[in-house]
Amino acid sequence: MNLKQKWDVYSRLTRLDRPIGTLLLLWPCLMALVLAAGGMPDIKVLIIFIIGVVIMRACGCIINDYADRDLDSHVERTKSRPLASGEISTKEALLLFVILGLAAFGLVLLLNGLVVKLSVVGIILTIIYPFTKRVTNMPQMFLGVVWSWSIPMAYAAQTGEVPIEAWWLFAANWFWTVAYDTMYAMVDRDDDLKVGIKSTAILFGKYDRQIIGLFQLAALLCFIAAGWSADRGLLYGLGLLTFVGFSTYQQMLIFGRERAPCFKAFLNNNWAGLALFVGLGADYLF
């Protein structure tokens, strides 16, 4: 395997070729940094968190594919993943995971002690998550915790503490993550039932759209509470209204429960997250 082929394999393993997950992690993290700073965050902290999000997203993908390597080959969407297809060995994948994990931890060591402690919890959660799909019908709810963990870390890095405002944002992102990852799980539902992978899409069954809607509403209310706690104004409110618009569009997409529209609904959450971040940023600027 030449260098170009190796890079292609690593890119697919870490999803560098599919940045949607990184972006969905990035928007709430940036929102947390902006809220914690009351505007523009410390540049050093900002750079560390942006790089950290990219690295930890890659780590999460590697450990997820390692855990699912024997199941992914039976699922249409995942059968070509490098570990499932045998393009890379488990030993090499785990080595890459360790290298990237150490790099992320090295970045964290540039910040304060509270962030370091929170980061240890974060990496443990990242490792545990892929295996929850074997034992619970609610892995998306565990993922919501994993994908929201950068929020208290961001507040800790910027202010040295984690106030109530941070937990409102944490709750908002948790509800939102469960909603959009259930859309994602709807894409694989038929295959998951065959191979024994558990998900909220399976758990919610025929009530999936309604329950996703409730989670979207809960996310909105918590985003409102986070903004209220930080005394945010009109432009943040416009960002929230745009979020509502995107959420409504996603409900239309998943109405027929077909694979392609459900995946499109999942991808659309990137724009919902961008709208929230832009609204928040504009509210501080203007």
UniProtKB/Swiss-Prot annotation:
GO terms for cellular component: plasma membrane. GO terms for molecular function: 4-hydroxybenzoate polyprenyltransferase activity. It is a multi-pass membrane protein. Its cofactor is Mg(2+). The chain crosses the membrane at residues 21-40, 96-116, 142-162, 167-187, 210-230, 235-255, 266-286. Pathway: Cofactor biosynthesis; ubiquinone biosynthesis. It holds the Pfam family UbiA. PROSITE patterns: UBIA (PS00943). It is found in: Cell inner membrane. It comes from the Bacteria. It catalyses: all-trans-octaprenyl diphosphate + 4-hydroxybenzoate = 4-hydroxy-3-(all-trans-octaprenyl)benzoate + diphosphate. It is an enzyme of class 2 (transferase). Its main location: membrane. Its EC number is 2.5.1.39. CDD domains: PT_UbiA_COQ2. Catalyzes the prenylation of para-hydroxybenzoate (PHB) with an all-trans polyprenyl group. Mediates the second step in the final reaction sequence of ubiquinone-8 (UQ-8) biosynthesis, which is the condensation of the polyisoprenoid side chain with PHB, generating the first membrane-bound Q intermediate 3-octaprenyl-4-hydroxybenzoate. Belongs to the UbiA prenyltransferase family. This is 4-hydroxybenzoate octaprenyltransferase. The gene is ubiA.
